[in-house]
Amino acid sequence: MDVQPATRRLILSTATRFFDPLGLICPVILPFKIMFQNLCKAQRDWDELVDTELNQGWLSNLSDLRLAGRVRFKRCYSEGLGENEVKSLQLHCFADASEKADGAVVYMRVEYESRVECEIMASKTD
């Protein structure tokens, strides 16, 4: 991704660029959505360059986005789900909200006879 000076249009484009139906990269995309909301509230033009402080946040968020490319998620939540040794399977949902955004995440916890596995299943922000 080329680093360009931040504008309202570019921030929205970045926030909506990714196909993420399970919401696994929501924490990385959320700062772009919040920046866009703030620019809308300030009634900034679509192609107007943001001020220096917001541009620093833009650059920091882009850096986080690049680092997120290194994160890997398993396609299979738990390799041993078909095994007889499953003692319990639980879904844990956590949610929180603020004035700027809200979010929720769901984890699956599988307890086996000899181990416990916990994997993220999905998340959502607004």
Predicted feature descriptions by range:
Residues 1-126:
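Conserved acidic
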